[in-house]
Amino acid sequence: ILGVRSSVFLPFRNLGLVIVDEEHENTYKQQDPAPRYHARNAAIILAAMYGAKTLLGTATPSIETWHNASSGKYGLVELKERYKEIQLPEIIPVDIHELHRKKRMNGPFSPLLLQYIHEALDQKQQVILFQNRRGFAPMIECNTCGWVPKCKNCDVSLTFHKGLNQLTCHYCGYTYQLPHKCPACEGTDLRNRGFGTEKIEDDIKILFPEAAVARMDLDTTRTRSAYERIIADFELGKTDILIGTQMVSKGLDFDHVSVVGILNADTMLNYPDFRSYERAFQLMAQVAAVSYTHLRAHE
């Protein structure tokens, strides 16, 4: 039986083995609606009830799983070599704060990343740019008084989606019309703050007008056919540069990717979550693994 997290509640009769793939994924935890449970933990208990074996598979184990394995509570099996003996990609950290201070940044892109993108395109290789924020800008702010539009339900800043010309709450899904002026001071100088995948797509198309660019996030993959089309076009070489959120890290392998750029990587460390450092590492490692040739740039 191949199933999602709710499959642990099926009426098994003779269970012998449970395999939890990518056990570190936070999507195994159901918070809303009830019942609230973690499918990985439920699978371990289920297997114990039937006297079955449990296999937790991942390249980036969760902290608790790694502790259980290293302390001897779980058995540990390691793969010492990569498939086809492919070498690990080179990771190049770039200090964008220093580049901003010297005014050398081109929007969200460092000179080094742009150089490697140019080289990859010249060599008919592909590029993946990872930004774990969808939309055009994570926040709109009045440049006169500092007013920021927030969701009336969640009290969080609203994300601006340029294609829809609206503000959206990414927590409850509520949408708002983009105001023409600030309701606090009636000023008209409303500025975008930050950048999401939609903004990255716009900027890349300006910087590399000859390249075929695609974006893969929740907004562009509402249907299964749209998701499959984006992946197929990239695999067939119809797309040169793929811009995406964490979707691009989910078990995808591409043969002709030579550059993966992780934009503003350190922002993932600042999420209001006690697992933010753990999840940042897991995401970066999974995105880097997408490159099966040679990772050149990592911001």
Task: Name each region found by the language model.
Residues I1-R296:
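Inter-lobe coupling/hinge segments of SF2-like helicase ATPases
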